From Swiss-Prot:
Residues 1-4 are intravirion. Induction: Early structural protein. It is a single-pass membrane protein. Residues 26-166 are virion surface. The keyword Transferase does not apply. One of its GO terms (cellular component) is membrane. It is found in: Virion membrane; Host cell membrane. It holds the Pfam family PAN_1. Belongs to the asfivirus envelope protein p22 family. The lineage of its organism: Viruses, Varidnaviria, Bamfordvirae, Nucleocytoviricota, Pokkesviricetes. This is Putative membrane protein 164. The chain crosses the membrane at residues 5-25.
Length: 166
């Protein structure tokens, strides 16, 4: 048969393959957060994970440029949302800013701005600025460049970057 050293190497390789196979089976694949609801995780790049939203953004959106003062975000269906954040208007991303107009919705102007982005061809990010005096009214902007550059802003802006598409 084979020399004992070769048999040990073959055995070692088989053990490594088994360990990797079990690890791969343990990782649950997903398309949306609801696929991960049984253990409280979120879907990031097709895998259920418990990493922070900010770490997920860095993994999911390659080449994103985040201002160091941005320390958190929130998972929402279809988007990562950032409070008090805007686009860096000097960046190529910021230069694609499209002013949709002032929006007002009785249920949620932020959600309305997000839904308008979903309907706009090429929109990969939205921004809602609640600078108006009337509650729930503000300006809605869209972005189409796939290399986001975000910076900290005043307390009236909310920004959303699309998940799992860039």
């Amino acid at each position: 048969m084979y020399h004992p050293v070769v048999q040990v190497l073959i055995g070692l390789i088989l053990v490594i393959i088994l360990i990797l196979g079990f690890y791969h089976l343990k990782k649950k694949s997903c398309k949306t957060d609801t696929d991960c609801k049984d253990n409280g995780h979120h879907c990031v790049r097709g895998t259920c994970t418990d990493i922070s939203c900010l770490e997920a953004v860095k993994q999911d959106i390659k080449g994103i440029n985040l201002d160091p003062s941005i320390r958190s975000c929130n998972y929402t269906p279809g988007f990562y949302t950032f409070n008090s954040t805007t686009a860096d208007l000097q960046s190529p991303f910021g230069k694609t800013r499209i002013y949709y107009g002032d929006v007002y919705a009785t249920w949620s102007s932020v959600d309305y701005c997000q839904s308008l982005c979903l309907q706009h061809n090429g929109c990969i990010a939205w921004e809602f600025d609640d600078e108006k005096e009337s509650p729930g009214q503000g300006s809605c902007y869209f972005y189409t460049n796939s290399h986001p550059a975000l910076k900290n802003s005043n307390d009236t802006t909310i920004m959303g970057i699309a998940r799992n598409i860039l």
